[in-house]
Swiss-Prot record:
Topology term for the membrane: Peripheral membrane protein
Segments of skewed composition (Polar residues): 10-20, 68-90, 108-126, 279-292, 303-317
Keywords in alphabetical order: Cytoplasm, Cytoplasmic vesicle, Endoplasmic reticulum, ER-Golgi transport, Membrane, Metal-binding, Protein transport, Transport, Zinc
Species assigned in the record: Bos taurus
Keyword presence, Iron-sulfur: no
Protein name: Protein transport protein Sec24A
Primary location class: membrane
Length: 1099
């Protein structure tokens, strides 16, 4: 029988909030119906205030990750302890206390000769200090290990090429971090069209102990997710309820204290933390035979995200819509455990997954199409309902039974989330009853089990719950008595319209405040013209409704406010020169209703760029301006967009230059940590008042982004960086700013959000990565959520999962849409539990592992040093491959033997070592390195991997063979090439997609056809040195090339600039710098790196 939708065990923290925009009530409890398993990229409706058109697909099918500053005073932040409410925590902080299914960890890091990253173990980590240099705070582990596993690893030495110092010291990248959530996507009817979904494993018959107050023994088949075994939930292990009731909501209340607002934990209560006073008996889960492989439906090249073919029109009444029939009725024969076992006996794992590869002999392992995530080894009926890996992804798709087994594998266990991703199809439920577990507060999901029509068992804590009367009726089929066919139980990603008990106050209106630097340096760059024009062009597209408010502040050595009160003939400037004691003049006229004062707003935007053209003021009072903006927004909350062009020089928050160009390569001398805690403290105040701060830094000089970035990191904001911005001297940056502003201003947004991740009893979350503040042990505060933000979490196995066959993770994002609706977006992921090392390696997701390690390495760079982080990355490869060689390989062979799943692990780690965040040498300016680290912490995984390991294509011979079709466009799909000059030829043209930049290298002997039909020049010498756009020519070659580049650019958080590079162009050095497999001035080639790894593994 089908299993209703209780949230799967908490996994990665992903924003589960629904997209902005009210759902249109159509008389049925549900609005816009979902399309079966179509939870990929989505298009957002114009009515929601977002961009009406979203890109059709990502070039890679990986959840992206957003940039997150690290906790503490560092930009990339180290872990911090979570303390009482008053003490805020930011990304990359360790959680302390009794979180739901969380594991306490010790954040202290001891520096030492051999830095390591221990993984958390089942014992109390607080009792055991972490090994020196370890990334992961947590319990001590007996065996040596990497930062990934929360245990110590042995020292390894890695020789470096040329000037590169040798990599010594054992480093582990396992440190706690917190994840934040993203914005919601387009809502769709929960009504689906298409064929019925296959039956999910029904629950096994359960025998109840005498006296159990839960009624007669249930009948039916085995639960699809978990076997029914009685397990006692102790206060230590039981997850706490988190979302329901007024006392359990995902919201935050602010009270006044000493003149400022203080955040209280009420949102924690709304989301649901804590258990009911009355204990409820739970039943044991009989062991169920292991489910076997089902693979995701194949996706077109380039991970095309398109809606399923037969999407039913939203205008049709529920009765006329064809929702896939879920599990069979209870009267039918259930799919029991015996049936499952026999049906799976003939299945076997794909032989390719068991291949052992010698990387020294098989070096060309990079696939020619985008790398797809591994498919969990689950029964087909369960896998069909699983969460899309673009939204929710685990580093290990087979969860080890014990922490000892995880430690033995020496691979990091964690989740990567893209919770608020734009979706084409999103089921939205408008029912007044949200069904949740009464004990752990998990939302009903496809992986719960129905004992009968009146009771369901939670797949996270195993409590048996009653099915509410309203849940018995299925509005899609208009049939009573089919709770297992409800949308909540048929969709791993779903959005709920939250009732009043999920609100601590009326939903806040959309409030947008813009803070502009108007000093002489700022006016010289000319940025104000571009920003004001972009605002004018997109004013009507700002997400919101009739309550939308807007305001403006400018500053140099003083602060300027602008009264936009309705009835004024023109905006009035109010100047506050006392920056030591900032006050708000006429606060009621500074944030005004956009609809009522639109003409005044437009007048101000047209005149602002000219108002300061003759200014001679060179000072910058950024700190006081931020304080003023915070005071202005405190009563309502909202989004603050700050534009800064230089180092702050006046008042609180003033900074001094710290960069020394000659010491850029000195890992111990570079300043990756903040020089003041002012910006972090202010960010925490902002978070408490539901204010997020987005920073746009446009500067040609050092501006201490390590310090300034804290204002966004801890308030769940974003950082945008435009080095050497100038409207005349650097026009390409002007184009980039305008494109990114257009997306920034019009994308959907969620306000006053909180996110919580739950997981099956026995697993615990100990570290979050991303831009947010950890309000209480496991509740992430997100004043704003957006669809371009990614998050990651680290986990450990706290209790043995021996009696558990399946585990689940569930993230819940509660937020207010731009239309003023309170919504909850829930993602649930189900994975199998395994008992052998081979199975753990078989299910390893190398991209997710690399993304999590990158986040941990950023923290290590800040808390220890850049060299420690680099060593830890190398040791991550050495330790895992050593574990495989010693424990999983039946016979020892010469060479570097790796399991097929990890064949790209050394390549991706080498790419990380050469990425701007971690590379050595004097090429990278300090602010550029810090910004790269911000991107690692805040970008979804798909973009992080593109930035780390770019995709290289040959484009002078594009054809329609193998092309995909998106919205009547034909998109060529050239094969992906290895990043080595061996793959280049002077008679071709090669395009490199590095995420935030595109580079088109044209060989000196490139064919005349490409030059004339695509570039529009007669010969090679006529290619402009500064060409950044391709001409739109009326030729098939031009159309194919432009279509391919446009497709790559779609739906990127950052607009990728295109550089056309001639063979002798200065930009060629940047192009070759991304050739990861080749030797550079300070890094080994891929083959040399493999030899080093082999030497260490064979020791």
């Amino acid at each position: 029988m089908s299993q209703p939708g209780i949230p799967a065990s908490g996994g990665s923290s992903t924003g589960l909030q629904a997209q902005n925009g009210a759902a249109s009530a159509s008389g049925s409890p549900y609005t816009n119906g979902p399309v079966q398993n179509a939870l990929m990229s989505s298009q957002v409706s114009v009515s929601q205030g977002y961009n009406s058109q979203l890109p059709g697909s990502y070039p890679h099918l990986i959840p992206a990750k957003t940039l997150n500053p690290v906790s503490g005073q560092s930009n990339s932040g180290g872990s911090q302890t979570v303390s009482p409410l008053s003490n805020y925590q930011g990304p990359g902080q360790a959680l302390y206390g009794p979180p739901v299914a969380s594991h306490p960890v010790t954040p202290s890091l001891h520096s030492g000769p051999s830095p390591q990253m221990p993984l958390p173990t089942s014992q109390n980590p607080a009792a055991t200090p972490m090994p020196s240099g370890s990334f992961l705070p947590g319990a001590s582990v007996s065996s040596p290990s990497n930062w990934q596993y929360n245990y110590l690893s042995q020292t390894n030495h890695c020789p470096r090429a040329s000037s590169q110092p040798t990599m010594t010291g054992n480093t582990n990248l396992m440190s706690p971090q917190y994840v934040s959530s993203g914005d919601s996507s387009l809502q769709n009817n929960i009504i689906k069209s298409g064929s019925a979904l296959p039956l999910v494993n029904p629950p096994l018959p359960t025998t109840f102990q005498p006296g159990a107050p839960l009624g007669p023994p249930p009948t039916g088949g085995p639960p699809p997710v978990r076997a029914l075994t009685p397990q006692k939930l102790t206060p230590r292990t039981m997850p706490q309820p988190s979302f329901n009731s007024t006392s359990n909501q995902e919201g935050i209340i602010s009270n006044t204290n000493n003149g400022s607002m203080v955040v209280h934990n009420n949102y924690d209560e709304i989301e649901g933390g804590g258990f009911l006073a009355t204990s409820q008996p739970t039943t044991k889960n009989p062991t169920m035979s292991r489910s076997v492989g089902y693979s995701y439906p194949s996706l077109p090249p380039g991970y095309q995200n398109t809606a399923p073919p037969s999407t039913t029109g939203a205008g049709l009444p529920p009765s006329s819509l064809n929702y896939p029939s879920g599990p069979q009725a209870f009267t039918q024969t259930p799919l029991g455990a015996n049936h499952l076992t026999s049906s799976m006996s003939g299945l076997s794992l794909h032989p390719e997954g068991l291949r052992v590869i010698n990387l020294l002999q098989e070096r060309n392992m990079l696939p020619s199409t985008p790398l797809q995530p591994p498919v969990p080894n689950l029964h087909e009926d369960i896998q069909k309902l699983n969460c899309n890996p673009e939204l929710f992804r685990c580093t290990l798709t087979s969860i080890p039974q014990t922490q000892a087994l995880l430690n033995k594998a020496k691979l990091p266990l964690g989740l990567l989330l893209h919770p608020f991703k734009d979706l084409v199809q999103l089921p939205v439920v408008t029912s007044s009853t949200i069904v949740r577990c009464r004990s752990c507060r998990t939302y009903i999901n496809p992986f719960v089990s129905f004992l009968d029509q009146r009771r369901w068992k939670c797949n996270l804590c195993y409590r048996v719950n009653d099915v509410p009367e309203e849940f018995m009726y299925n509005p899609l089929t208009r049939v009573y008595g089919e709770p297992h066919r409800r949308p909540e139980v048929q969709n791993a990603t779903i959005e709920f319209m939250a009732p009043s008990e999920y609100m601590l106050r009326p939903p806040q209106p959309p409030v947008y405040l813009f803070v502009f630097d108007v000093s002489h340096n700022a006016i010289e760059t000319g940025y104000l013209n571009s920003v004001c024009q972009s605002l004018l062009d997109n004013l009507d597209l700002l997400p919101g409704n009739t309550r939308t408010k807007i305001g403006f502040i400018t500053f140099d050595s003083t602060i300027h406010f602008y009264s936009l009160q309705e009835g004024l003939s023109q905006p009035q400037m109010l100047i506050v020169s006392d920056i030591e004691d900032v006050f708000i003049p006429m606060p009621e006229n500074l944030l005004v209703n956009l609809n009522e004062s639109k003409e005044l707003v437009q007048d101000l935007l047209k005149t602002l760029p000219q108002m300061f053209t003759k200014t001679l003021e060179t000072q910058s009072a950024l700190g006081p301006a931020l304080q003023a903006a915070f005071k202005l927004m405190s009563p309502t909350g909202g989004r603050m967009s700050v534009f800064q062009t230089q180092l702050p020089t006046l008042g609180v928050g003033a900074l001094k230059p710290r960069e020394e160009p000659n010491q850029r390569s000195s890992a111990k001398e570079i300043h990756l940590t903040p020089s003041t805690d002012f910006y972090k403290k202010l960010a925490l105040d902002c978070s408490g008042q539901q204010v997020a701060v987005d920073l746009f830094l446009l500067s040609g000089q050092y501006s201490d982004l390590a310090s300034l970035g804290c204002i966004s990191r801890y308030s769940a904001g974003s950082v945008y960086y435009y080095p050497s911005y100038h409207h005349q001297h650097n026009p390409i940056q002007v184009q980039k700013l305008e494109k990114e502003l257009q997306r920034y201003l019009t994308r959907k947004i969620g306000f006053e959000a909180v996110m919580r991740i739950r997981c099956t009893k026995g697993l615990s979350i100990h570290t979050f990565h991303g831009n947010f503040f950890v309000r209480s042990t496991d509740l992430l505060s997100l004043p704003n959520v957006n669809p371009d933000a990614g998050y990651a979490v680290q986990m450990s196995v706290e209790e043995s999962l021996t009696d558990t066959q399946l585990v689940s993770f569930q993230s819940a994002l509660l937020y207010t849409s731009s239309k003023g609706e309170r919504r909850i977006r829930v993602h649930t992921l189900c994975l199998p539990v395994v008992s052998t090392l081979n199975e753990v390696f078989l299910g390893a997701d190398v991209q997710a592992i690399s993304g999590l390690l990158a986040n941990m390495a950023v923290d290590r760079s800040v808390t220890a040093s850049l060299s420690d982080a680099r060593d830890a990355l190398v040791n991550a490869v050495i330790d895992s491959l050593s574990a495989y060689r010693s424990s999983a390989l039946s016979n020892q062979q010469p060479g570097l033997m790796v399991p097929f799943s990890l064949r790209l692990f050394p390549l991706f780690v080498l790419a990380l070592l050469k990425q701007k965040s971690f590379q050595t040498g004097t090429n990278a300016r300090l602010d550029e390195r810090i910004f790269a680290m911000c991107q690692v912490k805040n970008q979804p995984l798909v973009y992080l991997m593109l930035t780390t390991h770019p995709s290289l294509y040959r484009v002078d011979n594009l054809s329609d063979e193998g092309a995909i079709s998106i919205n009547d466009r034909t998109i060529p799909q050239p094969p992906i090439l290895q990043l080595s000059v061996e793959k280049l030829s002077r008679d071709g043209a090669f395009l490199m997609d590095a995420g935030s930049v595109l580079m088109l290298w044209v060989g000196r002997n490139c064919g005349q056809n490409f030059l004339s039909q695509v570039l529009g020049v007669e010969n090679y010498a006529l290619i402009p040195q500064t060409m950044t756009d391709l001409p739109e020519l009326d030729t098939p070659e031009s159309a194919r090339t432009i279509a391919f580049i446009s497709w790559l650019r779609e739906q990127r958080p950052f607009y990728p600039i295109l550089y056309v590079i001639r063979d002798e162009s200065p930009m060629k050095a940047n192009f070759l710098q991304n050739m990861v497999e080749d030797r550079t001035e300070s890094a080994l080639s891929y083959y040399e790196f493999l030899l080093h790894i082999q030497q260490q593994v064979n020791k």
